[in-house]
Amino acid sequence: MVKRFSWLVFCLLFSVGITAKGGGRQYNSYKGLVMAGYQGWFNAPDDGANRGWYHYTGHDGFRPGSCTIDFWPEVSEYKRLYKTEFKFADGTPAYTFSSHDESTVDTHFRWMKEYGLDGVFMQRFVGEIRGESGLKHFNTVLNS
């Protein structure tokens, strides 16, 4: 049953045409295209989503010794940043981004365009959009 459902999802995903956001260009096939998945699931307490440090938070919040990220993001090109409890070796505070900000999504898509990606699949996990908070957040990201 799971195998059949997975095949159905695969067929549905690949049977629809792709439209680029800016130009409205329609592709008839995925052959030769470079596609990516986009989650957009990071939040910060002051981003307006009311989800706190979502997807950054470890077993005891988002603070030194408790986080779920493997690497600190390079944030120099983001327009809006959020101060964290983390500090760099020189003692300066570490900042990060929120996917809830339209400017963050714009930055990510600009990077993908600059590096030659042809399109993106917006990934929406059922467990993430089951509640109103998650649904509102991911709709905001999708509409950005």
Feature annotation, model-predicted:
Residues M1-K3, A20-G22:
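Secreted/periplasmic carbohydrate-active enzymes, especially glycoside hydrolases
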Residues K3-F10:
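Sec-dependent signal peptide recognition
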Residues C11-T19:
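Hydrophobic h-region of N-terminal signal peptides that target proteins for export
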Residues G23-S144:
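Glycan-processing catalytic domains of CAZymes
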